[in-house]
Amino acid sequence: AKAFRVNMERIDWKVAALHWTPEFDYPDHVKLLPTSIKVLDEEMGNCGDYLLILYLDKDKLVEIGTKGIMNFPQGYYVYIGSAKRNLEQRIRRHRHLRKKMHWHIDYLRQESEFIGVIPIRTKRDFEHLLAAAISDIADWEIKGFGCTDCSCKSHLFGFYENPLHIKAFTKIEENFEINILNSYFDA
């Protein structure tokens, strides 16, 4: 993205909107959209929010720093986090097990399987909106987890099924990664 931004004046680039289906059928119509350097400048940095997906294969009691021992039922977990800078480094940190414990999620990560992470690159702060949206579809939440600096009830949500296979989850992802860009072009 950075290389593109540096060289974009030398490139004849276009932005297109097309209808897609879950089957990835060939689109019957493509519409060119107005382009905006502002969108690239505001949305392409190494910052933003992320959805970290973990899996626990059985119920576990885990010591979470100063919060003490907490119960985590078997299942999938989605943690909502943010990085005002160094998003890629934060995501890389969550992939690995050996690290200094800093955040609540670091403790749970030591006991869980890494499934994936979904970055949402933006300079806007969607962390709390994401937490609210995910809480609406989650099977349970871990109260007070990862939200000591805000008024959210939680930033960690549990699912019986892999959330990547849940249509409502992928719709939230789509809304925050793609559809949110409509605000730049709506009249």
PLM feature spans:
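Function-critical acidic carboxylates
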Residues: 97, 109-110
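Mid-chain, well-packed structural core segment of small domains
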Residues: 111-152
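GIY-YIG nuclease catalytic motif and its immediate N-terminal context
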Residues: 13-96, 118-125, 163-187
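Extreme N-terminal basic, low-complexity initiation segments
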Residues: 2-13
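Cytochrome P450 catalytic domain signature, combining two hallmark sequence patches
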Residues: 98-103
